[in-house]
């Protein structure tokens, strides 16, 4: 029996919820399905507050951003719980929350290595797509040999 290694990139959008729902509907309960829930976050800059008195003012902003990052990590755990409640076995779900080094699209392409299925959601907004090529488009054009499911 072939194993379905599924990558679920997650970026906290309503469309990403559709991708989660699709993965549950399509693959939950299948013993051969393994899911990696993945989010790569933009790292916070390191600020030396002793270098300048102006840098001290940034401390509260950085504290806020660090707290927001922690909330996002906890929110990803909630999504992991949704997958478990949806029918995936605990040992079949891996949650990855890591610092982004490359572009979001490149991180997804790197992470999908070894996976047989990628579940994406389409980004919303024609205006946004006009100004920046969507992550969805960059990932889809870069991949070969992976089944791509698009929840929209």
Write out the residue ranges for each language-model feature:
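Glycine-rich, Arg-bearing micro-motifs that act as flexible, cationic patches
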Residues: 117-143
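A short acidic, glycine-rich active-site loop
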Residues: 57-74
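A structural signal for isolated positions on well-ordered beta-strands in alpha/beta enzyme cores
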Residues: 5-7, 34-36, 94, 118, ...
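Short, flexible loop segments at boundaries between secondary-structure elements
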Residues: 142-152
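Short, hinge-like loop/turn segments at secondary-structure boundaries
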Residues: 53-56, 113, 138
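A short acidic, amphipathic alpha-helical/loop segment
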Residues: 21-22, 107-108, 135
